[in-house]
């Protein structure tokens, strides 16, 4: 997303969703890092806007992702969210409260990008691994598959539940395109061996 810029400075608005459980504690640490970053980069101006979302908000207002929060996320340059949902807080049909997945679907945040990098040899159980030896990127599709079937499952009998896993050409192609774009950017070395699995 683009941000408003004034001369050499830049101002970014971040919608902050602390969430539930350990979420607020994790968010406090993340905000401390952002505040320190602003001290180191005086031209960077961050406007942090707290927003209500999650299981606690569901209990309070009946909505895990209020319209005002969704609009704040839409208007922001970035969204920073922590853990959401509590095991004992359920919707009337028994499903957990998952506003983070609602956000993914609303904004089509289909890429789950998960880097894996070894910074220190002691961080790895692999005996010969040295810093930099482990450097890979995992991409996960975040909106299709079993995510698509939330609330659409079928219970034909009391002991059985059927679910639907959805994979579309559009969803697959956009993820593959993103994966190859990231591979071009990284391009540390050529792949020596690749394995393929049939996708049913």
Could you say what each language-model-derived stretch is?
Residues 9-14:
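Extreme N-terminal starter segment of soluble prokaryotic enzymes
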Residues 43-67:
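N-terminal beta-loop-helix "entrance" segment that forms/cooperates
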Residues 52-54, 142-143, 195-199:
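Glycine-rich beta-alpha junction loops
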